[in-house]
Structure formats: C-alpha cells, structure tokens
C-alpha cells in the first residue's frame, strides 16, 4: 500500500512559481485551458445581476417566481447534459477537442441571448451556454491535471477554480459597468462571447493530453509533450507509469468490452472506481448542498431580502462576496498541496455550517423587527393604492400586531418606507411600476423583495465570512479530487458521472431557492442548508481519502481495499495514508 506521503510531498507556492518559471509552457497550458473555468464562472454568475433588469423589461418574469428560477437554472440543466456527454466525448475525441466544442456552445448561447425578444429565447440561450458549462466543468480541470507535474498538480488545477471565481467576479464588474447602458442585460449576457473566441484560438495552438495520446497509440506525440513538461530525468518514469496504466486498461477492455454500456458496467464492477465514485460524488454533491450557488446566482436578490432595495446597491455589495470567492481560490492554491485536500474540505465545512446558522439567525431577527405598517399612510397614499390584503384593516382602530413590512410583502404588495425614518412604520401598497415611481417621487424607498433592516450589515458580514471559509476548501478542492481519484481508463467516464451529480445537485438548489424562501423564509432556507452541510461533512469524513502528492497509480492502490477514516480503521503498519 502507499506509504504516508505528507512530509516528503509537502510543497509551497514558491515551488509552483519556480517550476512554471523554469517551464513557462506548463503555465501557458494551464491558463489557456483555465479560460473554460472563466467562462464557467462568468455564465453562472452574470445572471445574478442580469435577472434584476430582465424582470424590469419583462413583466411576466417579475410576476412569476418559477420563471425567474427557470432562467437562472436552465444553464444548470444544460450543464447536466453537457457533463454527461462530455465524459464520453473526452474519452472518444480527446480533452482538447472537448474544450473547442464547449467554446462554440458558449459563443452560440451568448449570441442567442443578445438578440432575445422574449423570455423563452433567453432560456434557450442559457441552455446552450449550459451545454458549454457542463463540458468545461469537467474537461478544463482534467486537461490541466493531465498536463501537470504531480508535485504541483493540485495547485495548477486550482487555477481552474481561481478562474471560475474570477469569472464570477468579472461578471459582477460587467454588470455594474452596464447598469446605465441601454440594453443592460443584453450586454451583460453577451460579453461572454469574447473569452470563448480567445480560448478557441489558443486551444488550436495547444496539444492534446499526453495521457490520452498514449492511450490512443500516439506514443511519439505523447513523449514529445512530456519532454516539454517534465525534466529530462523524469520523462522515462512518467512514460513507464503511463505504459502500466494503458496495459491494465487494455486488459480490462479485453474482458469488459469497448462500448459505453460495457465500460459503465465495467466501471461499476471495479472496486477502485466504485470507491472513487463514492468519494467523487460525495464532494460534488456536498459542494452544492452547502448552498453556495444560491449566493452566487441570487446574491443581489439575497441582499435585497436583507433590506438593500436598489439594484445598483445590491449588485455593488454582491461584488464583495464574489471578490472574496476569488481571493479564497488563491488561498487554496497556496495550501492544497501543503495541507491536503481532505483536511481543507473538513475545516471548510465546519466554517460553512457556523456561518449558515448565524445567517439564519440574522434573517430571523430582520423579519421579526421589520417596520410596522402605518394604517393612515397606507390608506391615504394614493387612490386605490392600499394593498388589497391590508385594506380591510384600514378602517379598524388598530391593525393586527403581526402586520409589518414582511407580512405586507408576503401578500405580493410593496412597502413604501417612512420618509423621515426608514425603520419607522410605512405604507403597505399595491406592487406596481406606478406605485414604485410614486413612492420614489416622495423621496421614499420602495421595497418589494425585502424590508428595511438594521441587521442588513450583518448579512453582508456573514455572507462574506461564508465565502471566505467556502472558497479555499469546498470551492476548489472537489474538482481537484475528481481530477485525480479515478483510474486513467475510467477517468473521463467517472469524471462525467461525478460532474453530472454536481450539476443535478446544483439544479435542485437553484431551481428551488426562491420557492423555499417564499415557503419558509430566508431564515428557514439558510437553516436547511446548514443541516445539509452537516450531512455532507459526515460523508466527506467517512468516504474521502487524502490524495495529496500521490501519483495517479498510487491513488488506485489507495482505493483498492476501500477507504476508511483512521477512527474506524484498525491500527496496523499497513495504514495507507494518514488522514484526520
């Protein structure tokens, strides 16, 4: 079995820069492929701001929560299909060709959204982009992983995660840049065509993965690429490892066959693949059920829930969370090969659970202390302006004590804040563009998604802390684990299965978030995510081994007998890898 590797394989960011400085070709490969991560991040993040303006242009979107959820989640639905096809396509045609196809899909989707004249056209464009996101989500880290020396593999794969978060941060900047430009959301959604074109051109100049080439009997090309990546004295050892993997793969195929269904059956009958999938799917599902993409897809909306009514203000504040996510990815690059994948994820999950519980408490307090309804102001605001649900109480001596701003919004009405003091009682009125304009004309603020709150700043603080603890661990590490935990012969297939599990979980979360907040409130929704995060933490501890510093072939040996955490493992000299 593999001996404990942490001391001998420790690495710091200085070595990463030294290696890539001496061999700049490695960084060129990583950054070019990583643009797929940038596109992934941009196209999933840009909708957070664009949705606010899509709602303003299309009344039916503003009035239908389910339509908003479809626009947001259709990219995720497309990504499920893209990831599923991508696994097969990667193995059949190679990593490089898969990236090129993803770029074409990104470009087509962007063009469709730019010319959209109705919500269904936006949905179609989001679907096309989703196909590209799904392929990029598994292909970019896989390509980088197979092009990287083992000692800095984790850090270089983290560049893909960094570019995902960088793409999300860029999308928020672009959103702010086009706030006052005619066609706001069209520009926001269309800008993604530019990096797609750039990556397409760059990938035309780069080679295929040496591992895929060797598997497809293009050994001379594979050797040529390895000689450009590894020092001369390491090339033969790497080729020997590839030869052994391909020999084992060929032997397997002679037994299980060559078709997709045969490979799937063979993969599931292989204990190494089964144990790898248990770990890979666990981290992918856990990544989504901490609720991260509710923050990334809906962060301006969440901040409006917290009391920031202005679109521009909400987007500017949301930029903070996106920026912290990008910074956290840099931190991951610094520590993932020093402290290990497993430890970073476990620490990250503890922090996530803490922040989610506190956020639930913050939103609960904000709801309980929302401004009361001023009966006279609601009745006299304008002719036929009073919220229909509140109108019967305007004639009573005093309205029910449970009527506050939050109660008003629950009946799909709007709250016009008190002109003198935002936290004082205000008017509960009909929600319409005319009433919003009238409220603003009186120098007051109109709220329709959240209420004025003294707790709003706490929501920003703990959303920021949530991102800080998420990004270095659960943000990037699941993709690293899935790029190195499967045998070469099943890597594309198993990586596709794990990526599909990620996107299916993502779809569940993004498609239900607004519905959940309507049903149980923001507080209850964050509490649900805290509970699902606790479940995810347990299964990560139970099923996910440490792969830091291991060759792909060593990972296979680690998984042969199944992984058990040290607490559940008999103490023997044959313990595989020290894990917490």
Swiss-Prot record:
Q: Identify its membrane topology class.
A: Multi-pass membrane protein
Q: Which Gene3D superfamilies match?
A: MFS general substrate transporter like domains
Q: CDD domains per the record?
A: MFS_HMIT_like
SUPFAM superfamilies referenced in this protein's UniProt entry, alphabetically: MFS general substrate transporter
Q: Where in the cell is it found?
A: Membrane
Q: Where are the transmembrane segments?
A: 34-54, 69-89, 104-124, 127-147, 161-181, 187-207, 289-309, 316-336, 344-364, 455-475, 493-513, 524-544
Q: Which UniProt keywords apply?
A: Membrane, Symport, Transmembrane, Transmembrane helix, Transport
Molecular function per GO: symporter activity
Q: Which domain of life is it from?
A: Eukaryota
Q: Which GO terms describe its cellular component?
A: membrane
User: Which InterPro entries does UniProt cross-reference here?
Assistant: MFS_dom, MFS_sugar_transport-like, MFS_trans_sf, Myo-inositol_Transporter, Sugar/inositol_transpt, Sugar_transporter_CS
Which PROSITE patterns did the record assign? MFS (PS50850), SUGAR_TRANSPORT_1 (PS00216), SUGAR_TRANSPORT_2 (PS00217)
What is the purpose of this protein?
Plasma membrane inositol-proton symporter.
Family membership, please give it: Belongs to the major facilitator superfamily. Sugar transporter (TC 2.A.1.1) family.
In terms of NCBIfam families, this protein maps to: SP
List the protein's name.
Probable inositol transporter 3
Traced from the root, the source organism's taxonomic lineage reads: Eukaryota, Viridiplantae, Streptophyta, Embryophyta, Tracheophyta
């Amino acid at each position: 079995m593999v001996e404990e590797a942490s001391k001998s394989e420790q690495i710091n960011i200085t070595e990463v820069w030294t290696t890539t400085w001496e061999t700049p070709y490695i960084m060129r490969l990583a950054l070019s492929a990583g643009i797929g991560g940038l596109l992934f991040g941009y196209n999933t993040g840009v909708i957070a701001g664009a949705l606010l303006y899509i709602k303003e242009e299309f009344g039916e979107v503003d009035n239908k929560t389910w339509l908003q959820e479809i626009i947001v989640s259709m990219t995720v639905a497309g990504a499920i299909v893209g990831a599923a096809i991508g696994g097969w396509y990667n193995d059949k045609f190679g990593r490089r060709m898969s990236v090129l196809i993803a770029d074409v899909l990104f470009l087509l989707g962007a063009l469709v959204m730019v010319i959209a004249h109705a919500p269904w056209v936006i949905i179609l464009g989001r679907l096309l982009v989703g196909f590209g996101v799904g392929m990029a989500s598994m292909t970019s880290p896989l390509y980088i992983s197979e092009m990287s020396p083992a000692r800095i593999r984790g850090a270089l794969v983290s560049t893909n995660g960094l570019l995902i978060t960088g793409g999300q941060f860029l999308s928020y900047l672009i959103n702010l840049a086009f706030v006052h430009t005619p066609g706001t959301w069209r520009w926001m959604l269309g800008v993604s065509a530019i990096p797609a074109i750039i990556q397409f051109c760059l990938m035309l100049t780069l080679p295929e993965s040496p591992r895929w080439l060797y598997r497809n009997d293009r050994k001379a090309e594979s050797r040529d690429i390895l000689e450009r990546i590894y020092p001369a004295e390491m090339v033969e050892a790497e080729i020997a490892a590839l030869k052994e993997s391909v020999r084992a793969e060929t032997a397997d195929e002679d037994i299980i066959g060559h078709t997709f269904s045969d490979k799937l059956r063979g993969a599931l009958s292989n204990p190494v693949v089964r144990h790898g999938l248990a770990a890979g799917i666990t981290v992918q599902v856990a990544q989504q059920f901490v609720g991260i993409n509710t923050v990334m897809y809906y962060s301006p909306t969440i901040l409006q829930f917290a009391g920031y009514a202005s679109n521009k203000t909400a987007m500017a504040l949301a930029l903070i969370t996106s920026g912290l996510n990008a910074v956290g990815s840099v931190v991951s690059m610094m520590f993932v090969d020093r402290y290990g994948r497993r430890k970073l994820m476990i620490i990250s999950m503890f922090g996530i659970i803490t922040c989610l519980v506190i956020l639930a408490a913050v939103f609960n307090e904000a709801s309980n202390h929302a401004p009361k309804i001023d009966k006279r102001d609601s009745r006299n605001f304008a002719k036929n302006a009073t919220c229909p649900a509140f109108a019967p109480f305007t004639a009573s001596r005093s309205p029910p004590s449970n009527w506050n701003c939050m109660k008003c919004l629950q009946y799909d009405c709007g709250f016009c804040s008190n002109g003198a003091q935002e936290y004082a009682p205000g008017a509960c009125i009909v929600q319409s563009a005319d009433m919003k304009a009238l409220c603003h004309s009186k120098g007051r603020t109109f709220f329709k998604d959240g209420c004025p709150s003294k707790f709003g700043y706490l929501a920003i603080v703990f959303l920021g802390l949530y991102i800080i603890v998420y990004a270095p661990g659960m943000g990037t590490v699941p993709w690293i684990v899935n790029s190195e935990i499967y045998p070469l012969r099943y890597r594309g297939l198993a990586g596709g299965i794990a990526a599909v599990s990620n996107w299916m979980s993502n779809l569940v979360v993004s498609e239900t978030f607004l519905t959940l907040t309507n049903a149980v409130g923001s507080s209850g929704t964050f509490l649900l995510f805290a509970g699902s995060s606790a479940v995810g933490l347990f299964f990560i501890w139970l099923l996910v081994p440490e792969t830091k510093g291991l060759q792909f072939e060593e990972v296979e040996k680690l998984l042969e007998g199944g992984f058990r955490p040290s607490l559940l493992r008999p103490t023997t000299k044959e313990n595989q890898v020290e894990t917490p």
